[in-house]
């Protein structure tokens, strides 16, 4: 544990806040998604869901359903009450309309990466993640899944679907939705997101191993994920 805390402390986390976004609630409903199911093992296909569009957002926000208890809002990696808890099941779709379900019923560890298109730290972090991908440095069996959240039409790099392509993000990505009643981004809220980029590391049993917010270099990110998935013995 001492080494894990040292690794976390060594990572320079700098994040974008999400507490100043304005969400518009003029909604219309479109037909259920009919795209082919995903073939990526990090996610499972879900039944067709009704897609909700919001004025000004186009098709960049999608309907997301949550099953299970939401994780508490993130405050501190060192004393995070979410550690050991199962993630809730998130059912939605990608920007290509592919139905996606992310949940605790799994066989491999998973890193969830919540991104905001307008966040400079997200723009800095994606190349670091891509470098890890290209060098095949992730721990064996780790699956990486993105969540596009905090969508804001009046901010840079909108629409996020195009931004992700431009950034060479090749992992599956769930498009977040908006809860009209509470004024929150559904998937982000269910995971306790308080800044961007936000990461949730889940083990092969579906339990949270770690959460953190902010950008970090590739070497530090690999070390953190590896040590949390395969904890070293204390010395």
Residue ranges and their predicted role:
Residues 111-112, 144, 199:
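Hydrophobic beta-strand anchors of alpha/beta hydrolase catalytic cores
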Residues 100-123, 129:
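Short active-site neighborhood of thiol/selenol oxidoreductases, capturing the structured segment around
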Residues 1-89, 234-235:
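N-terminal targeting signals for export/organelle localization
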Residues 123-168, 178-187:
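Structural microenvironment flanking redox-active thiols in thiol-disulfide oxidoreductases
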Residues 167-169, 176-230:
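Thiol/disulfide oxidoreductase modules built on the thioredoxin-like
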Residues 87-88, 109-110, 196-197:
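Short loop/turn microsegments at loop-to-beta-strand junctions
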Residues 91-92, 201:
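Hydrophobic beta-strand positions
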């Amino acid at each position: 544990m001492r080494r894990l805390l040292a690794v976390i402390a060594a990572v320079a986390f700098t994040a974008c806040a999400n507490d100043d976004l304005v969400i518009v609630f003029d909604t219309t409903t479109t037909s259920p998604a009919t795209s082919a199911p995903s073939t990526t093992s990090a996610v499972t296909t879900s039944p067709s869901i009704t897609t909700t569009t919001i004025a000004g957002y186009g098709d960049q926000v999608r309907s997301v359903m949550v099953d299970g208890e939401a994780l508490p809002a993130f405050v501190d990696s060192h004393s995070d009450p979410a550690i050991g808890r199962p993630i809730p099941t998130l059912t939605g779709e990608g920007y290509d309309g592919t139905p996606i379900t992310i949940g605790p019923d799994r066989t491999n560890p998973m890193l969830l990466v919540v991104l905001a298109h307008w966040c400079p730290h997200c723009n800095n972090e994606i190349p670091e993640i891509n470098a890890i991908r290209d060098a095949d440095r992730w721990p064996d069996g780790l699956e990486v899944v993105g969540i596009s959240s905090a969508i804001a039409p009046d901010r840079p790099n909108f629409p996020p679907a195009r931004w992700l392509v431009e950034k060479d993000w090749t992992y599956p990505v769930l498009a977040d939705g908006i809860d009209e009643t509470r004024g929150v981004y559904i998937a982000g809220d269910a995971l306790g997101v308080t800044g961007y980029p936000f990461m949730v590391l889940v083990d092969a049993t579906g339990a949270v191993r770690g959460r953190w917010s902010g950008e970090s270099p590739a070497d530090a990110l690999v070390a953190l994920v590896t040590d949390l998935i395969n904890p070293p013995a204390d010395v």
